Amino acid sequence: MAGDEAGVTLGQPHLSRQDLATLDVTKLTPLSPEVISRQATINIGTIGHVAHGKSTVVKAISGVHTVRFKNELERNITIKLGYANAKIYKLDDPSCSRPECYRSCGSSTPDEFPTDIPGTKGNFKLVRHVSFVDCPGHDILMATMLNGAAVMDAALLLIAGNESCPQPQTSEHLAAIEIMKLKHILILQNKIDLVKESQAKEQYEQILAFVQGTVAEGAPIIPISAQLKYSIEVVCEYIVKKIPVPLRDFTSEPRLIVIRSFDVNKPGCEVDDLKGGVAGGSILKGVLKVGQEIEVRPGIVSKDSEGKLMCKPIFSKIVSLFAEHNDLQYAAPGGLIGVGTKIDPTLCRADRMVGQVLGAVGALPEIFTELEISYFLLRRLLGVRTEGDKKAAKVQKLSKNEVLMVNIGSLSTGGRVSAVKADLGKIVLTNPVCTEVGEKIALSRRVEKHWRLIGWGQIRRGVTIKPTVDDD
């Protein structure tokens, strides 16, 4: 990549130019044209029960099929988190009625294009660039869903019109986004083409009753058919009007949570042609730039001769940044960003870096091995009905020495409860985690061979370890 000359023209010349030489981070906003031309600045999760059409809705809006892996295609379910970016446009002709004046396209579409609606004039102009985090709806994949929730700004809750509401995962996901303090939710009543009008009305009442008293109370309910792309522009309009652009911090030291990582080299590649590992994630704050020196924590985890955990942070350099197929010179908080580094690709392959935190050297938070948390348990297990009883099983109190699954940011790790008192608990983590006091964590327990969400906590303090650094 030629990056030396000023105002370097990146790939995709039809998109806005980015120039590191003239970059002033204090002037950037989540709607700056040079930012949203190339990358998404809002993350929207799709949540809901398995087979209610989450991936189909994302495909209808963005044109990207989020089911990428062979075993996912065969079983037609999402297993890993799927991602897709979409640009939302609005026609600048005031005579065009809504919702027809809204349109969504893929992320490489130019920022402006002429109208093709008969009887209208003017151009479709880019108003939002959104990243969809397509979460699995399967109960066994709840951990993946929670990892996705760590980066969401808003959620589309999908409910299939041809099934009764709520289905088990629908309530579990709703509780999860409540924990993550997501306030902006759109409810999509999908598969409306499969039911009679009376049935749709009846289910609408069910949905209203179901969301009463939850974060989704008062959320708009939009009847759609994702398969037939019916009412998709209505969804686009609601995304623009109902989901506020999140306030972002562009000036702090950058920090990115890794939610995917891969080795992009093909087998049999010449040594000289090897590329460094790629980390995919969402920037929480700050701006990453091509050429910047970075640190990844906790890095490489090992044990010393006494069995104590040790962490060696990875130091590297950013060689490329991209959002889907768009090259970037700098990346802002928001949608999913791919960071090409000089890290040994074997450390990144097959999502090995998930749960790590990448950022400016020396500016990342501490690495914890034990956490002291104040926690809150759900009263009943979501989605699990006990045999012969219509009510869900009660959540038992935390007991000493039990092993829970803890979700911190995008990391899922085991944690042994070492002490518990009233609403305080101490948890010894299986894997060290780079996090801060005050962060929220989700707790899951193994019930009938599945991990089920049982509550959440907030980090009060913990035991940190000093990272080891090579003395070269």
From Swiss-Prot:
It is an enzyme of class 3 (hydrolase). It catalyses: GTP + H2O = GDP + phosphate + H(+). It is found in: Cytoplasm, Cytosol. PROSITE patterns: G_TR_2. Keywords: Acetylation, Cytoplasm, GTP-binding, Hydrolase, Initiation factor, Nucleotide-binding, Protein biosynthesis. Its EC number is 3.6.5.3. One of its GO terms (cellular component) is eukaryotic translation initiation factor 2 complex. Member of the eIF2 complex that functions in the early steps of protein synthesis by forming a ternary complex with GTP and initiator tRNA. This complex binds to a 40S ribosomal subunit, followed by mRNA binding to form the 43S pre-initiation complex (43S PIC). Junction of the 60S ribosomal subunit to form the 80S initiation complex is preceded by hydrolysis of the GTP bound to eIF2 and release of an eIF2-GDP binary complex. In order for eIF2 to recycle and catalyze another round of initiation, the GDP bound to eIF2 must exchange with GTP by way of a reaction catalyzed by eIF-2B. Residues 190-193 are annotated as: G4. Eukaryotic translation initiation factor 2 eIF2 is a heterotrimeric complex composed of an alpha (EIF2S1), a beta (EIF2S2) and a gamma (EIF2S3) chain. eIF2 is member of the 43S pre-initiation complex (43S PIC). This is Eukaryotic translation initiation factor 2 subunit 3. Pfam families: eIF2_C, GTP_EFTU, GTP_EFTU_D2. One of its GO terms (biological process) is cytoplasmic translational initiation. InterPro entries: EFTu-like_2, eIF2G, eIF2g_C, eIF2g_dom_2, eIF2g_GTP-bd, P-loop_NTPase, T_Tr_GTP-bd_dom, Transl_B-barrel_sf. Residues 225-227 are annotated as: G5. Residues 48-55 are annotated as: G1. It comes from the Eukaryota. Residues 76-80 are annotated as: G2. Transmembrane segments: none annotated. The modification N-acetylalanine is found at A2. Residues 457-469 are annotated as: Interacts with CDC123. CDD domains: eIF2_gamma, eIF2_gamma_II, eIF2_gamma_III. GTP binds at A51, H52, G53, K54, S55, T56, N190, K191, I192, D193, S225, A226, Q227. Residues 39-247 form the tr-type G domain. Signal peptide: none annotated. Residues 134-137 are annotated as: G3.
